[in-house]
Amino acid sequence: MNFPKELMYTESHEWVKIEGDKALVGLTDYAQSELGDLVFVNLPEEGDEVTAGEVFLDVESVKAASDVYAPLGGVIEEVNEELLDRPGWINEAPYEAWLVKIGEISDREKLLTAEEYEAVVNSEKE
């Protein structure tokens, strides 16, 4: 299991790469491995406002449909439209296959370091 140290994480298994007042968001390696092969990604619209901790998109795998929670508050600035045609990219390269870019970010204080997130994953595996 891979936990890049330069990223931040959530307990609901999203990764966050903060770049100034913007952030890229994706699903962690653990999330994609638990979901199985992804077959569909339902992305939000650019310009949508999101609230930290609330559902803002969903993904479907061969196992189930799953909600994805916004790790931060802000405004959707960009969505990764490549995932609409290639949702399996998340399984292949979870830390490259970002879902959205959020601008005007807020509510960073609940994000976890790689070490904190690894402890969350290890406790879920037990």
UniProtKB/Swiss-Prot annotation:
It comes from the Bacteria. The keyword Thylakoid does not apply. GO terms for cellular component: cytosol; glycine cleavage complex. The modification N6-lipoyllysine is found at residue 63. Its cofactor is (R)-lipoate. Residues 22-103 form the Lipoyl-binding domain. It holds the Pfam family GCV_H. Binds 1 lipoyl cofactor covalently. Keywords: Lipoyl. InterPro entries: 2-oxoA_DH_lipoyl-BS, Biotin_lipoyl, GCV_H, GCV_H/Fam206, GCV_H_sub, Single_hybrid_motif. The keyword Transferase does not apply. GO terms for biological process: glycine decarboxylation via glycine cleavage system. Coiled coil: none annotated. Belongs to the GcvH family. The glycine cleavage system is composed of four proteins: P, T, L and H. The glycine cleavage system catalyzes the degradation of glycine. The H protein shuttles the methylamine group of glycine from the P protein to the T protein. This is Glycine cleavage system H protein. It comes from Clostridium kluyveri (strain ATCC 8527 / DSM 555 / NBRC 12016 / NCIMB 10680 / K1). The gene is gcvH.
